[in-house]
Amino acid sequence: MVFILKIFRLISVWLLNSEENLFLSDATLSLRENTMKPTTFFITAATAVSILLICCSEQCDLFLTGLVYQNGFYLHENLFVDAADTYGEYAICALFAAVCGIFALKQKFRTLISNKLNFINAKTMLFLCISFFGWCTALPYGFKIFFRRARPYQTDIFAGDCTFTNAFVKSFCPAGDSFISGHTSFAMWLFALALVIPQRIRTPSITAAVGIVLTIAASRILGGYHFLTDVYFAILLTGCGIWATYKTMFIAENCANPPETGTPVSHTTTRLYENKL
């Protein structure tokens, strides 16, 4: 557990201080400080919740899962749970395919694509592909194969055959693939997409993406497919990976080319630069 906490600490330090050696103007520093305030709060809150869930994994997981269990997981066949389980990943795959299709058409028939879709360029596609295949697909399945954690309905506590294990504890359940949640991680690609769409609709898009992710995460718990820690760490780890990639590819580059020091920065220029962040 000490090793895991050290990893969270290193991630926090990197996310906060990776631009420390850049020479920034006063205007840029001010913008950076305003940008970092919510990031600092998020990292502090996420670290605190993570430590709590790691230390109290058994109590939190069994209590919440027990609320939806009564001689079986009675919401397992619920229409909402079944729809999220069956169609959620297909819908995201279709959306990813649509974005790839738009990018391909732009390369061939530029005049046919609306200017509103100009944000789908080579750099954006690279970011979305890294997020889709790396953080949202390879990462969760790597965790599943390594930890082999039993799903709630597979544990002996809930009429299964495998032993319950805490989060980040390697299990030996042959069919165990609970940690971390694949559906939840996959849904986090919507967050990656929301980060690169035009600024004017970015905030509502991020809000919608987070809402969809939380809805899918809730359905995984209600159906007895995952524990609370499975979906929480799926969101946290996948989200950190996506944000670190976005920060490296977009924010760090913008900060590396700020307005020159000593050059008067107009209100319009400041707003344009802030929009890039």
What are these regions (language model features)?
Residues 5, 22-24:
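Short hydrophobic targeting helices and cationic amphipathic motifs
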Residues 11, 26-100, 144-149, 156-163:
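N-terminal transmembrane-helix/juxtamembrane module of multi-pass inner/ER membrane proteins
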Residues 97-110, 187-196:
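Hydrophobic, aromatic-rich transmembrane alpha-helices
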Residues 54, 61, 139, 143, ...:
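Alpha-helical membrane-inserting segments
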Residues 110-142:
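Interfacial segments of alpha-helical transmembrane regions
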Residues 108-113, 146-151, 155, 201, ...:
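Membrane-interfacial segments
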Residues 37-47, 163-277:
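Membrane-embedded catalytic cores of phosphoryl/pyrophosphoryl-handling enzymes
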